């Protein structure tokens, strides 16, 4: 064992200060990066929702698979301290690479605001995420155990309080990061053009991880550093493998059956190890249904965040970003854990109900299932507010009069009269085969026929400004703007080209009496500048939008005033989101309550039922259930392809209820044990065996005393 001089502070080893600060910074780094990851995939890399969800959950699964590797390295090779330092360096590099991958100007050679070589960003992102998964997962089983190693015998009370402080540091880091990094994301930054500031939002977590590493290394001289004692997981695997191989080797009836399949390892392994593995496998068997809970729980960062992008973030005077809704879980967990421990559980006990650990976990599954039912109800309400878009062989038309004359528009079954600078109330839907001709006219003028080839499944805007002057514009917006952003396009009624710059994005060379394509912006007031060679120098070229909310689309008409200066008129194409993000709070509340009675209880149950030297084995098994849960999401998201998102939520809720019933049946037949008593019995037996070997008269003397 590597020892250093012990320093204490109020009875606690001073070294744990460095470990707690390290954990706070590391959790800030991890959860801060993870909070914005799904929106980075959809907004910056432009993956669709299903692929983004799949990559997100693949990453999370890797983060919970690599703890096994970290435990192996620490126990059999480097020890906990060197493992934490080595993998923290890998972790920091991964965060830095991810931040670099999000720099738009890295490949934006033509300075148009979009990457010219998206594969470069994708490859860098995946390399960064792989390094992060190796780093965060590898140190996960080491840091808390290393903190526990710092205490002396007789400091059990301080050690227990340390784990409470450690858990608080985790939640504090998670809470702050999920508030701060989304705020950094919505800032505008860039060298040649301005975009959502992902480099800063990823860069701050990278800096915090570097701080975590530095703080941890600074405490090096105060730590107790135990040398690797051999990997118990390897011994467990070898014993199980030998038992299975030996059992199949003696399949014939000539060999008598043994009480337990692990008893076939007795030829090579001692009774104590076999008994300990039996305890572990009994708990591991109960772990089989548990991944389904995590399949639902970890969708907070994917599906639920994407759901929030279709909602309004205005809550009173506050404006909540979609990825900030995850802070609700972190806030509620800090509130609910003490309420459950100090109020709810004692109240249940006073009522005479034996609320065992496994019963609590089953209740947690039910609560998580209910949370997804609530999420489905919220999704149905969201779907009701969505505009109707053309399907199949349908086409939608909106007419916008950008001239100074009253115009009459004749469509199949529709006759519309529009005054100057006005539009139809909504998009009109037609069968594409029947929309062969649109007639436009004004009082005293001949009729002009519009016979353009309207593309099926598309929205079109018919710009008219005189009886024989029109322009058909394909909108290119056949769904609500994604990620809660707002679509803006401009129509030029000048007789010359104009260029408009808005928040770093350029609408270049919009031709006369034509429309630009939509560009997309986050919520807020956006400034824009109109430039043209024909605008007099005394004119004010700078304008502001009104306040953009979430998920809207607008057409801005640029027209000339009597003094030849430009002015702007606005028409709504798609209304803003109206279902408020606050409606997600009930589903977060139910899921958080489920987490308290499932996750916290599950860890306590695993610890209490594990032999002293195999608690790390069960910890690795517990983390493995999280990884498998994320793999389940991958399978469902990849294979389901539901046309309605609420249906996927209901499927997950139903699957978890079925799994809960199976788990309840399995738990019914589980017998709680006290590993300490079993190990004490082995200690007593081994002590007797040693006495027998050293004193052959030990048993005979004892027997003679019994006879006296």
Curated annotation (Swiss-Prot):
<dbReference type="GO" id="GO:0016324">
    <property type="term" value="C:apical plasma membrane"/>
</dbReference>
<feature type="topological domain" description="Extracellular">
    <location>
        <begin position="104"/>
        <end position="118"/>
    </location>
</feature>
<comment type="subunit">
    <text>Interacts (via extracellular domain region) with trypsin.</text>
</comment>
<feature type="topological domain" description="Cytoplasmic">
    <location>
        <begin position="349"/>
        <end position="361"/>
    </location>
</feature>
<feature type="topological domain" description="Cytoplasmic">
    <location>
        <begin position="75"/>
        <end position="82"/>
    </location>
</feature>
<feature type="transmembrane region" description="Helical">
    <location>
        <begin position="119"/>
        <end position="139"/>
    </location>
</feature>
<keyword id="KW-0571">Peptide transport</keyword>
<feature type="transmembrane region" description="Helical">
    <location>
        <begin position="277"/>
        <end position="297"/>
    </location>
</feature>
<keyword id="KW-0653">Protein transport</keyword>
<feature type="topological domain" description="Cytoplasmic">
    <location>
        <begin position="220"/>
        <end position="276"/>
    </location>
</feature>
<feature type="transmembrane region" description="Helical">
    <location>
        <begin position="585"/>
        <end position="605"/>
    </location>
</feature>
<keyword id="KW-0813">Transport</keyword>
<feature type="transmembrane region" description="Helical">
    <location>
        <begin position="646"/>
        <end position="666"/>
    </location>
</feature>
<feature type="glycosylation site" description="N-linked (GlcNAc...) asparagine">
    <location>
        <position position="404"/>
    </location>
</feature>
<feature type="topological domain" description="Extracellular">
    <location>
        <begin position="383"/>
        <end position="584"/>
    </location>
</feature>
<feature type="glycosylation site" description="N-linked (GlcNAc...) asparagine">
    <location>
        <position position="50"/>
    </location>
</feature>
<feature type="topological domain" description="Extracellular">
    <location>
        <begin position="641"/>
        <end position="645"/>
    </location>
</feature>
<comment type="function">
    <text>Electrogenic proton-coupled amino-acid transporter that transports oligopeptides of 2 to 4 amino acids with a preference for dipeptides. Transports neutral and monovalently charged peptides with a proton to peptide stoichiometry of 1:1 or 2:1. Primarily responsible for the absorption of dietary di- and tripeptides from the small intestinal lumen. Mediates transepithelial transport of muramyl and N-formylated bacterial dipeptides contributing to recognition of pathogenic bacteria by the mucosal immune system.</text>
</comment>
<dbReference type="GO" id="GO:0005903">
    <property type="term" value="C:brush border"/>
</dbReference>
<feature type="transmembrane region" description="Helical">
    <location>
        <begin position="328"/>
        <end position="348"/>
    </location>
</feature>
<feature type="transmembrane region" description="Helical">
    <location>
        <begin position="83"/>
        <end position="103"/>
    </location>
</feature>
<feature type="glycosylation site" description="N-linked (GlcNAc...) asparagine">
    <location>
        <position position="562"/>
    </location>
</feature>
<dbReference type="GO" id="GO:0015333">
    <property type="term" value="F:peptide:proton symporter activity"/>
</dbReference>
<dbReference type="GO" id="GO:0005427">
    <property type="term" value="F:proton-dependent oligopeptide secondary active transmembrane transporter activity"/>
</dbReference>
<feature type="glycosylation site" description="N-linked (GlcNAc...) asparagine">
    <location>
        <position position="439"/>
    </location>
</feature>
<dbReference type="GO" id="GO:0006811">
    <property type="term" value="P:monoatomic ion transport"/>
</dbReference>
<dbReference type="GO" id="GO:0140206">
    <property type="term" value="P:dipeptide import across plasma membrane"/>
</dbReference>
<feature type="transmembrane region" description="Helical">
    <location>
        <begin position="54"/>
        <end position="74"/>
    </location>
</feature>
<feature type="topological domain" description="Extracellular">
    <location>
        <begin position="183"/>
        <end position="198"/>
    </location>
</feature>
<dbReference type="GO" id="GO:0071916">
    <property type="term" value="F:dipeptide transmembrane transporter activity"/>
</dbReference>
<feature type="glycosylation site" description="N-linked (GlcNAc...) asparagine">
    <location>
        <position position="514"/>
    </location>
</feature>
<comment type="similarity">
    <text>Belongs to the major facilitator superfamily. Proton-dependent oligopeptide transporter (POT/PTR) (TC 2.A.17) family.</text>
</comment>
<feature type="topological domain" description="Extracellular">
    <location>
        <begin position="298"/>
        <end position="327"/>
    </location>
</feature>
<keyword id="KW-1003">Cell membrane</keyword>
<dbReference type="GO" id="GO:0140207">
    <property type="term" value="P:tripeptide import across plasma membrane"/>
</dbReference>
<feature type="topological domain" description="Extracellular">
    <location>
        <begin position="22"/>
        <end position="53"/>
    </location>
</feature>
<protein>
    <recommendedName>
        <fullName>Solute carrier family 15 member 1</fullName>
    </recommendedName>
</protein>
<dbReference type="InterPro" id="IPR018456">
    <property type="entry name" value="PTR2_symporter_CS"/>
</dbReference>
<keyword id="KW-1133">Transmembrane helix</keyword>
<feature type="transmembrane region" description="Helical">
    <location>
        <begin position="162"/>
        <end position="182"/>
    </location>
</feature>
<feature type="topological domain" description="Cytoplasmic">
    <location>
        <begin position="667"/>
        <end position="708"/>
    </location>
</feature>
<dbReference type="Pfam" id="PF00854">
    <property type="entry name" value="PTR2"/>
</dbReference>
């Amino acid at each position: 064992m590597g020892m250093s001089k012990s320093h204490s502070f109020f009875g606690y080893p001073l070294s744990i200060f460095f470990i707690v600060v390290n954990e706070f910074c590391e959790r800030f780094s991890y959860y801060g990066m993870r909070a914005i990851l799904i929106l980075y995939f959809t907004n910056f890399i432009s993956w669709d929702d299903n692929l983004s969800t799949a990559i997100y959950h693949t990453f999370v699964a890797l983060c919970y698979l690599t703890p096994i590797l970290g435990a192996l390295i620490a126990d059999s090779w480097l020890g906990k301290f060197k493992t934490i330092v080595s993998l923290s360096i890998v972790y920091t590099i991964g965060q830095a690479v991810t931040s670099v991958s999000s720099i738009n100007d890295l490949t934006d050679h033509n300075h148009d605001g979009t990457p010219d070589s998206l594969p470069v960003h994708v490859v860098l992102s995946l390399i960064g995420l792989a390094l992060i998964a190796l780093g965060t997962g590898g140190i996960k089983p080491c840091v808390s155990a290393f903190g526990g190693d710092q205490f002396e015998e007789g400091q059990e009370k301080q050690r227990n309080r340390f784990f409470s402080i450690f858990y608080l540091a985790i939640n504090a880091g998670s809470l702050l990061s999920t508030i701060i990094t989304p705020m950094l994301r919505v800032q505008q930054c860039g060298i040649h053009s301005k975009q959502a500031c992902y480099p800063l939002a990823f860069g701050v977590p990278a800096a915090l991880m570097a701080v975590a590493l530095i703080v941890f290394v600074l405490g090096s001289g105060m730590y107790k550093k135990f040398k690797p004692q051999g990997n118990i997981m390897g011994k467990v695997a070898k014993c199980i493998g030998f038992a299975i191989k030996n059992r199949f080797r003696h399949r014939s009836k000539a060999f008598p059956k043994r009480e337990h399949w692990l008893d076939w390892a007795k030829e090579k392994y001692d009774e104590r190890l076999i008994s300990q593995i039996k305890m572990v496998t009994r708990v591991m068997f109960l772990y089989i249904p548990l991944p389904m809970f995590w399949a639902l729980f970890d969708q907070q960062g994917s599906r639920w965040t994407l759901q929030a992008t279709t909602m309004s973030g205005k809550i009173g005077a506050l404006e909540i970003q979609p990825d900030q809704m995850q802070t609700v879980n972190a806030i509620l967990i800090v509130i609910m854990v003490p309420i459950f421990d100090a109020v709810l559980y004692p109240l249940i006990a006073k009522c005479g109900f034996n609320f065992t650990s496994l019963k609590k976990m089953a209740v947690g599954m039910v609560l998580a299932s209910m949370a997804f039912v609530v999420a489905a109800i919220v999704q149905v309400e969201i779907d009701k507010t969505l505009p109707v878009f053309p399907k199949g062989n349908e086409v939608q038309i909106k007419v916008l009069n950008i001239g100074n004359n009253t115009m009459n528009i004749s469509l199949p079954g529709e006759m519309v009269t529009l005054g100057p600078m006005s539009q139809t109330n909504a998009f009109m839907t037609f069968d594409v085969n029947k929309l062969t001709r649109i007639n436009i006219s004004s009082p005293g003028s001949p009729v002009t026929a519009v016979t353009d080839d309207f593309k099926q499944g598309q929205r079109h805007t018919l710009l008219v400004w005189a009886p024989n002057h029109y322009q058909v514009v394909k909108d290119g917006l056949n769904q609500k703007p994604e990620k809660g952003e707002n679509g803006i396009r401009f129509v030029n009624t000048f007789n010359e080209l104009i260029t408009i710059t808005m928040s770093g994005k350029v609408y270049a060379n919009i031709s006369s009496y034509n429309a630009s394509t939509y560009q997309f912006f986050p919520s807020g007031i956006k400034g824009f500048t109109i430039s043209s060679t024909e605008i007099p120098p005394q004119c004010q070229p700078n304008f502001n939008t009104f306040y953009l909310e979430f998920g809207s689309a607008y057409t801005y008409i640029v027209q000339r005033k009597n003094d030849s200066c430009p002015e702007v008129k606005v028409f709504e194409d798609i209304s803003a989101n109206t279902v408020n993000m606050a409606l997600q709070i009930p589903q977060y509340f139910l899921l958080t309550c489920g987490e308290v009675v499932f996750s916290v209880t599950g860890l306590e149950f695993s610890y209490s039922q594990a032999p002293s030297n195999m608690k790390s084995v069960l910890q690795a098994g517990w983390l493995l259930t999280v990884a498998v849960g994320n793999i389940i999401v991958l399978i469902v998201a990849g294979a389901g392809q539901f046309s309605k998102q609420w249906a996927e939520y209901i499927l997950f809720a139903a699957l978890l209820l079925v799994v809960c019933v199976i788990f309840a049946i399995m738990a019914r037949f589980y017998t709680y044990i006290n590993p300490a008593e079993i190990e004490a019995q082995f200690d007593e037996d081994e002590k007797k065996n040693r006495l027998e070997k050293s004193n052959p008269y030990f048993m005979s003397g004892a027997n003679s005393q019994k006879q006296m």
